[in-house]
Amino acid sequence: MSPSWLVIGLGNPGPRYDGTRHNVGADVIAELCRRAGEKLSPARGQRAELVRTRLSSAGLGVPAVDAQTVILMRSRTYMNESGIAVSKVASFAGITPDHLIVVHDEIDLDPGRLRLKKGGGDNGHNGLKSIRAHLRTGDFIRVRLGVGRPPGHQDPADWVLARVPARQRAEMGVQVALAADAVESIIIQGLAAAQNRFNS
């Protein structure tokens, strides 16, 4: 069965970036894979790691519906080239922008906050900027995880590329799990229902 959705979690590749604020989107993909009992694998010629799986309404507390076939994806490019991988995979799988979900960090939301939206600008986020450029549209769904702004005069780039302190990791883990719930809700129940439930 052809996939009906593509979900990408933005982040930078390699262990150097594991646990950073900028990689929280990729952490959500890892959580969705864990729930599905799946692992990402390199996709030949597409500069991405991905897995095709099925999501159902089992964990959402809503009536059962037909499971949806989705591609869960993490780019193997750096953040500012995310659009290269997204456009390749979307084109290959026949996914249109309205069935693309991009999960990413958002400095204009406080830590722990979650916001779902469709369309809009890139707000200086280089991953979103690259995806918009390569798809030639910003008309895709975003799951935005708040990481907050840096204190004082710290460079925002240094802030998002820093690892989350140990004392905040539990809170971040809760946020990642909630964002994974939100992705499942968008796919099974639709964006409006998911926004009503998860926007904070």
Curated annotation (Swiss-Prot):
It comes from the Bacteria. It catalyses: an N-acyl-L-alpha-aminoacyl-tRNA + H2O = an N-acyl-L-amino acid + a tRNA + H(+). The record marks 12 as: Discriminates between blocked and unblocked aminoacyl-tRNA. Its EC number is 3.1.1.29. InterPro entries: Pept_tRNA_hydro (IPR001328), Pept_tRNA_hydro_CS (IPR018171), Pept_tRNA_hydro_sf (IPR036416). Keywords: Cytoplasm, Hydrolase, RNA-binding, tRNA-binding. GO terms for cellular component: cytoplasm. GO terms for biological process: protein quality control for misfolded or incompletely synthesized proteins; rescue of stalled ribosome. Its main location: cytoplasm. Transmembrane segments: none annotated. It is found in: Cytoplasm. Monomer. HAMAP family: Pept_tRNA_hydro_bact. Hydrolyzes ribosome-free peptidyl-tRNAs (with 1 or more amino acids incorporated), which drop off the ribosome during protein synthesis, or as a result of ribosome stalling. This is Peptidyl-tRNA hydrolase. It comes from Cutibacterium acnes (strain DSM 16379 / KPA171202).
